[in-house]
């Protein structure tokens, strides 16, 4: 269904969707608009005493584009057509966002519209809350459950807290984190904390934390010297 949002740049921003109640927001306030994953068309009405124009961030132009004029004078409108948010062979159809900036001709008044399209919620989580390894295990593999594509996994981040871990890396698909270290010849177990995270287009961060324990070296049993019992003196 085609929807209309009215923008009054000079004084207030008026938001109206269908027959819903209008919401009045003071000028220069950012506005968030959320639509379903389905393809559709969205229109924005603009009211200002003078000239105005609207622009879109470059990254969003792959799935969202303007139809008709993107500038005017006084009362006017601009229309946005957007694609369905679904798996396209590269992206899984995660939630996404386009950014529109409406600005008056003098450049002194502007409103930013965050145009958000619903989709799959990102998932990144370790398969276990903690991992325990023997003292002589020097390579650790930590599996990660994720619904991100290889392309999207490039924006995953991870952090290792544990100075005894000598090296680490994440696989290109974000499905595994590898840790390397030395044999633990110490008397105490070594503990590291690993966090993996992903921030989506809406600015929400999804994270998971796990604990890695490398056990201490087993203590060798003490060697006891076998003593012969003392010979008793014969009493006569």
Question: Which stretches of residues belong to each language-model region?
Answer:
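Short, solvent-exposed loop/linker segments at the N-terminal edge
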Residues: 33-39, 131-137
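Surface-exposed binding patches on compact interaction domains or structured appendages
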Residues: 45-79, 148-178
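A short beta-strand micro-motif common to beta-rich folds, especially ectodomain repeats
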Residues: 90-106, 188-200
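C-terminal edge beta-strand
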Residues: 107-120, 202-218
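Short, surface-exposed loop/turn segments at beta-strand-coil junctions that are enriched for proline
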Residues: 83-92, 182-187
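Sec-dependent signal peptide recognition
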Residues: 2-10
